[in-house]
Amino acid sequence: MTQYTFKPKDFKAFEVEGLDARMEALNEYVRPQLNQLGDYFSEYFTSQTGETFYAHVAKHARRSVNPPVDTWVAFAPNKRGYKMLPHFQIGLFKDHLFLMFGVMHEGKDKAERVKVFDKHFDVLKQLPEDYQVSLDHMKPEKSYIKDLSDDELHKAIDRVKNVKKGEFFVARSLSPKDAELKSDKAFLSFVKETFDEFLKFYE
């Protein structure tokens, strides 16, 4: 019995039609692991940073018609919310699991906060080749850093400073059948390895 990881059938919760039915499926197949991961990694980030981190599992409470196409747990050193701060995420779309760290468009002082990626641009470029960037957390599409030129990366970072909807996240993904999801041990190891890379950008 696994506690933290996700099986291929768990991703199928996003194929369930209708808001209520999909929420029921997410609550049964996905949220238990998000809650466990929330407990585990809020402690992990607290120990790694010396700040008290809190987990925020998506509730999708504002939805009244359209079922969610993704769900997540986010981590930030604020009990009341995470969107205003640079934050970490573990989440799922129907075809992949994602890990992310960065600045959301709702972020407070986001033009300043995103400069950490300018400051550590060489570190960003040297991340392993399966690392990605997401420029819109609401869309599943992500680009591999290795496929982007320095100019494209700089423009993506600058967009956060100049465009209201601008966002920048460094990311890493798994497909539902990847070996890293086969056991809790393998999955937790993958997540820690990834977050340790992301922590290089946390200040």
Curated annotation (Swiss-Prot):
Pfam families with a match to the protein in the record = DUF1054
What SUPFAM superfamilies does the database record attribute to this sequence? YktB/PF0168-like
Matching entries from InterPro entries are given as: UPF0637, UPF0637_domain_sf
Q: Indicate the family of this protein.
A: Belongs to the UPF0637 family.
HAMAP family referenced in this protein's UniProt entry, alphabetically: UPF0637
Q: What's the protein here called?
A: UPF0637 protein SH1846
Tell me the organism. Staphylococcus haemolyticus (strain JCSC1435)
